[in-house]
């Protein structure tokens, strides 16, 4: 299993990077960040679309840093194998999408060699995360719903 991220750490989002030519940006960011934050969106859980697994596969060989893949998706289990194959080191599904299968999903993430985190939306009570604290390495607290 991947060791937890240092606490605190500085993660750079790649959501606004140049998707056609990530190399210059990634090479520079390798020198100033602790890790990368990569947004995956399915257009259902989040109305937007995020980065795709093929882009992650192209970007990761350029990176010397660990990455946190923020899974803004309705069915996190569907994405785990693809994201692990792409090189993810930390998978962070939303607590709102985990439902009754939270423990199972977090276990599957760890069994695949990744760190496990959860993200929480601003209107979701923190109590929804409390029972997961012993099973996670990271919490991403959203500032937008």
Place the predicted regions along the sequence by residue:
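Conserved N-terminal beta1-alpha1 strand-loop-helix module at the mouth
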Residues: 1-92, 97-103, 107-116, 129-136
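Histidine/lysine/aspartate-rich catalytic loop segments that bind and position anionic ligands
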Residues: 119-145
């Amino acid at each position: 299993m991947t060791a937890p991220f240092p606490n605190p750490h500085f993660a750079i989002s790649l959501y606004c990077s140049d998707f056609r030519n990530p190399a210059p940006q990634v090479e520079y960011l390798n020198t100033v960040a602790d890790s990368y934050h990569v947004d995956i969106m399915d257009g259902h859980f989040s109305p937007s679309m995020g980065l795709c697994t093929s882009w992650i596969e192209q970007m990761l060989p350029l990176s010397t840093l660990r990455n946190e893949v923020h899974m803004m998706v309705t069915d996190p289990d569907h994405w785990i194998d693809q994201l692990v194959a792409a090189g993810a080191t930390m998978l962070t599904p939303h607590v709102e999408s985990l439902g009754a299968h939270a423990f199972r999903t977090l276990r599957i993430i760890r069994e695949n060699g990744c760190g496990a985190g959860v993200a929480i939306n601003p209107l979701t009570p923190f109590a929804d995360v409390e029972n997961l604290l012993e099973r996670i390495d990271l919490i991403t607290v959203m500032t937008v719903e």
